[in-house]
Structure formats: structure tokens, C-alpha cells
Amino acid sequence: MKEARLSRLVACASTVAVLALASGCTMLSVDKRSFYQYDHPSAVEDGSFRRSLDAFGNTMVGGNRVEILNNGDAIFPAMTGAIRDAKVTVNLESYIFKDDKAGAIFADALMAAARRGVEVRVMVDATGSSRSGALLDRMRKAGVKAYVFHPIRLWSLYKIGRRTHRKILVVDGNVSFAGGFCIANQWMGDARNPKEWRDMMVRATGPVSAQMQAIFGEDWTYTTGEILAGDKFYPHIEPAGEILGQGIKVSRGDSSSLAAMFYFVAIESARKSIHIQNAYFVPDAQIRAALIRAAKRGVDVRVMVPGRHIDMPLLRMASRLHYGELLKAGVRILEYNRTMMHNKNAVVDGLFSTVGSINFDARSLLQNNEDSLSFYDRDFGARMEATFAEDEKHCREVTYASWSRRGIEQRIAELLSSFLQPLY
């Protein structure tokens, strides 16, 4: 059986990992952090909750217009269209930028912008875009400033765990995109079949784009030394709408795990509903405890994760290990089975929403550089809820009874996968 073979593979891989850890040869380190204590959390509807969000690095700013972009058929034209309309600057950061049809579409738009005099900067990750050197060279020849974050070299292998998982596009300093979308063929289409992945981006127009520009600038300056400042990067931005928005920056140097703390506070503040969509859902003990407490106080907690089409089956097994305690508490777990679901978004009490690159796993919460755009708006929250409800039509709900019927081999594989998941 395929599952049995996978289980044996996990067992072998676990042995290798344990030996590597024992000999001090592991290439990843997970920073120690405190167990959170958050007494008397404000409800999401309270103004104090919104003001408390400012503690996560950026102040909530108004005057934004936000569009939800579902799947490649909406995302590709929106992002490449913004690049084509650029007049001054284009700054793009992507974990994956493949040298394939999708990559060519973006590269053509970026090169055309550079040729007409727009300053174009591209930052890709060395691991996620490891085979894109020729494509980057073509862009450089056209005038694009293209760099690789943390190139993998023999003498710096100890840094291999430091990755940028961010997905950011900022155009002319006032239009920004964030979400789970990467530049590769599987993100094309409309999630109609397993070859077309399900994903979401948001396009924000307005003052919050300056915060996303600064997040891009952090990795750019770290890699190139160039400081992005002045009017061409931070122009005066007129209000484009009424939505309150906030750019969330997560960096490896953040030993308290801003990403985990951000979600922890939102979960503890929920009074009505928590609807999460996440591609790699392996939350730590305190996030699980927060979700359990929310469900027990009557909050409608639903977590949507990939089903059988997940691209990383070991992560799915690690995720399923902890389903039992969540299901017993009343958390509903929905497996999306139409195709691979790559979303990283949530909406709390229909009012607070977030869309970005952050997964619920150890790498996102402790290792990677990540980003998210968060919004505090009832109408936008309703749009997020509608999107969640539409995706629910393609899900199978996991019950405690079905979860309990797992065989011993699968249970062992899940346990071993959980030990390995920080390395994925």
C-alpha cells in the first residue's frame, strides 16, 4: 500500500533526523520562547482590540480599498496588470519564482516595465527558486535588479534554515499585494482540478501599502545594502477607501514568534467565530489550547486544510496527529479535496481578517521571514466569510469517529512526522 510505503519512509527519515540531531549536525535551530499569558482579552469588536494590534509593529491605518483575488485566473492579470501600469517603482518578493510558463508571464511584465524606465526590484528565495538562475539572468539583462535571498553556499550551510517565505508586490508605493500565491504553473487556472491550486491574494490600494513597502525593504536592504527611502518609494498616498489595514512583518530574529502571538491574541479575543484556511496546519501546543478554549466557550471554530491533494503528505500526517483533541473540544476540521489548497488566511468574528504567507507550522512561526495584510472591517470580513463558505462546498468534514479509526501504522507515521516537521 502507498500509505504503508510512506510510513516506512517516515520511519527511515526519522532515524536519520534523530542521528543528525544527536551529532549536532542539524541545520535548523528553533528559538526558545515563552508560553503566552493573555489575561482578560478584549473582544474583537472592542476598540481596545484594534488598538492592541498596533503592538505587532505597525499601526492600523485607514483609507484603504481591498480586493480579494481568488486563484490564478484572477491573481495573474491583477498582479501583471499592476506591473504594466507602474510608473515609478515595482518591488516583488516571492519564495518561488519558477522558470516556467507562469514565470515567463511575470518576467515579461517585469522586463517590459524596466525597459520603459520603471525601477524594478525582484527578490527570490534561494531554496524556493533554486532552479531559476537563467530566468533571473534574463531579467537582469533587461534592467531588472534581481537578487537571491540567502544564496546556498558550502561555507554558509549553517544558515540554510533562514528563508524568506514572503509573497509581496508593491507598485508605485501605493498598491500592494499579499497572500499565499507563488509564481509557478500550479498557481495558474481556477482550482478546477488537481493541476490548478487553490490560493488567495489581496490587492490593497492606499496607505497600508507603505507598510508592505517597508517589509519588502527589510529583506532588500539585508541582501543588497540598498536603503529604499524617499518619495519614489513612500509617496504621499491619498485615501482610496475606508478599510483599516495593517502590514504584519515576521522575521527570523523575532524569538518571541510574532506570528504565533498575533494569531494567539486574535483567537483568544474571538466571541463568535474563527474561520481559518491554512495549507500547513501544525500549530504548537499553545495555539491548539487557544483554539480549544475558544470552541469550549461557544465560538464557531472551523479550520480548513488540504485533503488528499496536499503537496507535502508528511505535513498532513503531522497535522492529523493533533486532530483528536481539537475535534473533541468542538473544533470543526474541513479537508479541501478539489485540489491543493495553499491559502493562509483567517477571519475572526466577521470583523478581523488576515491574508498572507504565514503557515501554522514551526518553519513559519519560528524560522522564516513572513508577511501578512490584516484588516479591521465588517464588509471586508463578510467577503472573506463568503469565500470561506464557497470553499466549504469542496470539503469533507473530519469527525472524531473517523479520526479514531486510524490504524496503528498510520498513528506511528503521524507521530514520527511530527518530529520531522520543523525540517520541512
For every predicted segment, state its role.
Residues 24-424:
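Charged, low-complexity intrinsically disordered terminal segments
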Residues 2-14:
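Bacterial N-terminal signal peptides that target proteins for export
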Residues 1-2, 27:
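Basic/polar N-terminal segments that are highly enriched at the extreme N-terminus
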Residues 12-22:
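Bacterial N-terminal signal peptides
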